[in-house]
Amino acid sequence: MKRAIIHDYLYVHGGAERTLAQVHAIWPEAPIHTLLHLPDRFPPAFNDMPIQTTWVNRLPATSRLARFYSLLQPIAFSGLHPNADTVISLASFGAKAVRPIRGGRHLCYCFTPPRFLWGLNRGTNLSGHVAPVQMIDTILTRWLRRWDRRAANRVTHFIAQSRYIESRIARIYGRSSRAVVHPPVNVDRFLNQPDTAHGHAGGNDGYLFAVARFEAYKRLDLAILACRRLGMRLRIAGLGVDEARLRTLAGDDPNIQFLGAISDETVAHERAGCRAFLFPGEEDFGLTAVEAQACGKPVIAYGVGGALETVVAGVTGTFFSEPTTDALADTLLSFKSTDFNPDDCRTQALRFAPDRFRTALHHAITILEGEPGE
């Protein structure tokens, strides 16, 4: 059985790329096809993977223009025909367009339908731009949506990364998912992190911690405004296009601290010292919330999306029900981290360990390789 792995692109090392590394561990002989690859942005282990790029990788200034070039996925992937009985795509956008050989299977592990295309990134459209830009954006979006739905029809079977994404695949593509396999989280590096909260975890004198890309849909604005209102300490790690707005919301409040882009080791240290991890956005899965629980820390999350699959209410965290400052502030006022057992948090995190992911995905792929398409 010949297999080929397809990944949208390799220009940033995030959760999707960590998932790719685990899929490669299952089928190390399978070639990995991707739009483009910037090796200097990835751990050395990626240099040993059988990565094959499209013609886009040969375009000029790929390092600077990688995000722009990602819009070429419909052209680049539509012409890709790997010699494999089973195509396994790890896709949000273009990778699901690859056609298998005649009689072959295309099994898509779907992270999400593209956020930028289906209005899933609140506050990131072009509605504030001048009319000609809006018109171009509308025309391009309509074309890309039609193409995205056609690409989804090339998939034999979908596997969703969460129940939340399963429902999104059904709503946008009209397709069912044959399995749900939660993505892998490297929990081992957090499990033995010493707690450095120094006895303040149960009161309001300890700090709250959040880490995320600074984008509007992450809703860090709610965390900032709620903590300012209550006089609670908040430490935020990350960078992104929303930084200027978030800093304006924080003003000169000394309780709100921006840490910038910090190392994984520093993130782990910050988590170990907090009294709770804030997770205020509507997320597809919730990798950072799992990492926080692996540190033995409870999570305060917006009660929708992937958070409902990664956090156990009253056991490893608590939810606020509306995406408003008032709702989050009310939850923060009633929250006491001494109500949560760190061992329960760590046990929950272990459900998403890489070995469990590899076992579950291998089982799902093996079954679906023998089944006819929809």
Regions found by a protein language model. Give the residues of each.
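A charged, aromatic-enriched C-terminal amphipathic alpha-helix characteristic of glycosyltransferases
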Residues: 323, 337-366
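Nucleotide-activated donor-binding/catalytic signature segment of Leloir-type glycosyltransferases, i.e.
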Residues: 244-266
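Acidic donor-binding loop of glycosyltransferase active sites
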Residues: 208, 272-284, 297
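Conserved donor-binding/catalytic core segment of Leloir-type glycosyltransferases
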Residues: 194-218, 224-235
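Active-site donor-binding segments of glycosyltransferases and PAPS-dependent sulfotransferases
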Residues: 29-96
